[in-house]
Amino acid sequence: MLVTHIFLLTLSLSVPTLGQYEHWLYYPEYQASQAPEPLPTPARNVPQIHVRLAGEKRKHNEGRVEVYYEGEWGTVCDDDFSMYAAHIVCRELGYQDAVSWSPSSKYGKGEGRIWLDNVNCNGREKSIASCGSNGWGVTDCKHSEDVGVQCSDRRIPGFKVSNELPGQLEGLNIQVEEVRIRAILSAYRKRVPVTEGFVEVKVQGSWRQVCNAEWSSKNSRVVCGMFGFPAEKKFNNKVYKLFSSRRKHTYWQFSANCTGNEAHLSSCKVGGVLTPDPKTNQTCSDGSPAVVSCTPGRAFAPSPGTGFGKAFRQEQPLVRLRGGANTGEGRVEVLKNGEWGTICDDKWNLVTASVVCRELGFGSAKEALAGAQMGQGMGHIHMSEIQCNGFEKSLIDCKFNVHSQGCNHEEDAAVRCNVPAMGFENQVRLSGGRHPTEGRVEVLMERNGTLRWGTVCSDTWGTMEAMIVCRQLGLGFASHAFQETWYWQGDINADDVVMSGVKCSGTEMSLAHCRHDGANINCPRGGGRFAAGVSCVETAPDLVLNAALVEQTTYLEDRPMFMLQCAHEEQCLSSSADRTSPTTGYRRLLRFSSQIHNNGQADFRPKTGRHSWIWHDCHRHYHSMEVFTHYDLLSLNGTKVAEGHKASFCLEDSECETDVQKQYACANFGEQGITVGCWDVYRHDIDCQWVDITDVAPGDYFFQVIINPNQEVAESDYTNNIMKCRCRYDGHRIWMYNCHIGGSYSTETEEKFEHFSGLMNNQLSTR
C-alpha cells in the first residue's frame, strides 16, 4: 500500500488554478526557529480569510503568500515579516511549522491588491488576520516586495479546515492529509511496487474513496506521478465495478480537476462538490471508486516471471542525473553533439523538472533544485530558460534558450523525482551507533526457509558497498566503511553472518542487488567484531581534473639522474632507473600540470587522521594519502606500458573561487584536504609530477589519470574521476589530444575515441 502526504487546497472555481502558483529561493538568514505553541487569543473581530501559496513551484509546500479577503486574492508585503508570521501562515494551511521565508518577490510578483503590510505576529495567533498590520489594503509596497514562505512537510494531525467564508468558496476548503493507491485485486496485493487500485484520500483521520463520476485520465496521470510512475494505463473496469457492487464505500465529498501536468495532486483544482442522492444519501450513487493503473519505469518493473504487465520503456535518454545520493535525484545533464553538459536554473520549476523525471522512468518531480545543490558540473551549459507544458516526452522538446550568457556552473539545475515505494529500507538497518546515521549493518535475509536478521561479513567491505547501504536507507552518502565494529553493540539476536562476499558496482538500489555468496556463506574471520559497518552523511565531495590544462601543459624533459635522487628514493622512476648511471644517465619524463577541483557539496578529506600521515624528507612535508592519483600510459589495448610516477600526495587548497576561503595547507603540519569551491594544483615542474617514459617505444597510446583510484574517500560521483587522452609519441616529441573527463562523452562518441587511429591536425595526418 502506497501512502504520501499532500497539502491543503484552498481554491475557487472562479480563480486561477493553483498549478501556476509557487516559490523557489531559500534564505538561510530567515531559517526556521522552533515555532511557538499556539495559545488561545483574546476574542476580537477577526475576519475570515483564506491563504494559499502561489508562484512558480519548486516544491508543493512553498510559495508566495496570498490572502483571500472580501472576494479578492491579494499578496502580503515583506516589511516587518518574520518567522513568527511564517509559522502562522503554514499552520493556517495545515502544516506544523515553517522552514523559512523569502522577501522581495522571490516567488515571482503577484497581481492585484497587496492586502497586508508591516505584519507583526507573536507566533501564537490562529490566523495571519489576527496579527498586527497597517490594516487591510493600507500599504506603500509594490509587488516586488511580495513575501513567500516554505512550510515543513509535517502535517497537523486532525487539522480541521474552516468553511465559514460565504459565496463561491463555500465548501471548497478541502484538507487532504494523505493519498494512497490501495490494491484491490489479489493479483496486485502482494506486488511491489503497488501499481493499481482504488484512489483513496485521508480526511480528518479517515480514509475515503474518490468517486469516479468526474475522474479523468489526467487525474490518474498526476496520481501515478506522485507515486513514482511515469504514466497511467488502461485497466479492466468491469472487474472493479463487479467488486464495488458488493462493497459499501465511504466517499470523499469532492472531486478533483487536474490538467495532467501538475507534479502533485495538491496543485489540482477542486472540481466540485458531490451532492448526495436524496433517496440513498450516497454522494456517488451513479458511480464507483476511482481506479488508477500505473506503468512503472524499467528499473522498477518486477521480473517477467511474476506475470507483470508491460513496463514503461523510454528510448535512449538524452538526459541523465549526476551527483545525487538517492535513486531519482541529481544534477540534470543533457547530451548535445555527443557531449554531456548541464542546464541553467533560470525558469527552472516543477513542471519542467517533471518532464526530466518521466523521461528517465520516474514519476513527477518532488523538488526542482536551483543553485547547484547537487554539485557543479564541468564543460558546457547546453540549455537555459527552459519552459515545458508538462506533456513533452523529452526535455529537448521544450522551449529553451541555446545561449547560456550570464549562467555559470553555480546555477546548475537539479531535481528530486518521486520514485516507487519498493520497501528496500525495510531490508537493512544500522545497529549500535551513536546516532541513526551510523552503526553495524544488519540485513534481513532468508535462511533455512525463514527471514532473519544478521550481520554482513566485512572481508570484501568497502566504500562502494557502504554507499549502497546509505542509499537504501535514504541517509545520503557513506562517509566511512568499517571492517571492524566491536565498539558498536548490535542486536544480540542478529550476531550471525547472513551475507558474505558482497561486491557492489555503485548503481544498485539495495545491498541484495549486489553480487554476494547467497546461501553459501564464506567468512573466514567470522562476524562479531569483524561485521561490516557504515557511517552516512548528507553531502559528499566530488573531485574532477581539469582535462584542458593537462592537454595544454604536456611536454617532454630529459632530466639527468643526478637531479633525480629524491625522486628515485620515492620510486617516481621506472625500475630501469636502478641500472642507469647516476652521473651520466638521464630519464625521459612526460611532464604536465594537474588541477583537481572539488565540485561537490563537502570538503575532500584524507581517510586517515594526522597520526597516520607519512613524513617525506625530500619534500619536507607530510603526505596524507599514499594512493591519491594514478598516472598511466596505456597501449591501445589497455596494457600499462610505463611506470614511475607520483603516487603519494599532500592535499591543500592551492586556489579557490572568489567567495571561498582557503582552509587546508601542507606547510607546518597543517590540516590537509580540498575545500568545496577550491582546487589543488600540481605544477608540471614539481618533483614526481610526471610519467617516466624512458623505456617506451614510439607509437599511439592512451594517457590516463585516475583520482582517488581505490575509492578510499567517498564521493558523490566516481565516473568523473577518470581523465583520458589520446597520445602520439614519435620518439622525440609527444602530442596529447582529445583529453576529456570520464562520462563527458556519449557512448557512441567514446567508442570513436577508443578506435580513432590517428591525430587529425597540421602536425600529423591520419594513418
Swiss-Prot record:
Its EC number is 1.4.3.13. Ca(2+) binds at D542, L543, E715, D717, N720, N721. Glycans are attached at N281, N448, N637. Residues 51-152, 181-295, 319-418, 428-537 form the SRCR domain. It is found in: Secreted, Extracellular space, Extracellular matrix, Basement membrane; Nucleus; Chromosome; Endoplasmic reticulum. SMART domains: SR (SM00202). The modification 2',4',5'-topaquinone is found at Y682. Residues 1-19 form the signal peptide. InterPro entries: LOX-like_protein, Lysyl_oxidase, Lysyl_oxidase_CS, SRCR, SRCR-like_dom_sf. Cu cation binds at H619, H621, H623. This is Lysyl oxidase homolog 2. It comes from Xenopus tropicalis (Western clawed frog). The gene is loxl2.
